[in-house]
Amino acid sequence: MADLYGLLPGWGRMPPFLLYTGFGWRAMRLGLIQMDVVSGDKERNITHAFELMGKVSHQADMIVLPELWTIGYDFHNLGKNATYMGDGLIQRLSSLAAYTGTYIIAGTLPVKKGGVIRNTGLVFGKDGDIKGEYSKPVSYTHLRAHE
């Protein structure tokens, strides 16, 4: 990798990651967000994640968030903490991607669709549009039987 730094001046402290696109290799800078998620404290986790994304967005081509970064593994409050596809959090992620021109892989979120909550990963393009969505096949419904 040291040789690669010499070939790509201006990369600064964030080392490039090589991605094969089908048209050849492309160097990308990844902003991998690692954070202490406070279980059940959705607002604090979201605020902290956006602070961290703000710090790396000017250097990164793509930002990657961790699994269940909004609520951790707080399955007791899934009903009140689930995200809906059109809600403010989705809009904020979309706006950040578009504003910074950065791809965002939004880790996974508990997303509620049609009365079912699933662990869902979202990919936002540089234009802010959702480019990919994947929900794990197992829902959280069985964990919410006591609600």
List where the protein language model places each region:
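Cys-nucleophile CN-hydrolase/nitrilase-fold catalytic domain and related Cys-dependent amidase chemistry
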Residues: 42, 53-126, 133
